[in-house]
Amino acid sequence: MKYIILLLPFFGFSQKIFSVDYPSQSDIKVFVVDYESQSDLKVFKVDYPSQSKGNKGLWYFVKYPSQSNKKIYFVNYSSQSDLKIFFVKYKSQSGWRNNSKKYLLY
């Protein structure tokens, strides 16, 4: 029973994202790539917060920083980023391409 309780925070994580205006306000810096093959994470923007369960690239953009799990800043150059993302058209296409970067969204 102890193990289940300890693991729940990892499974209950959702990706509610807030885009900040300055790099110093962010938890991570993100660059949007032109091609899926260049990305660490394929992201699908969902319409409701309840759809953003898990660390699977399903992002819900919130209106206020206090509602978010992570604050991101979109950078202009790939070299400035912590994470490279590619926006996909379908929910089923979302997910990690580079598992070594998963820790950034926990």
Describe each model-derived feature in a short phrase.
Residues 1-12:
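Sec-dependent N-terminal signal peptides
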Residues 14-106:
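Repetitive, compositionally biased segments used for assembly/scaffolding
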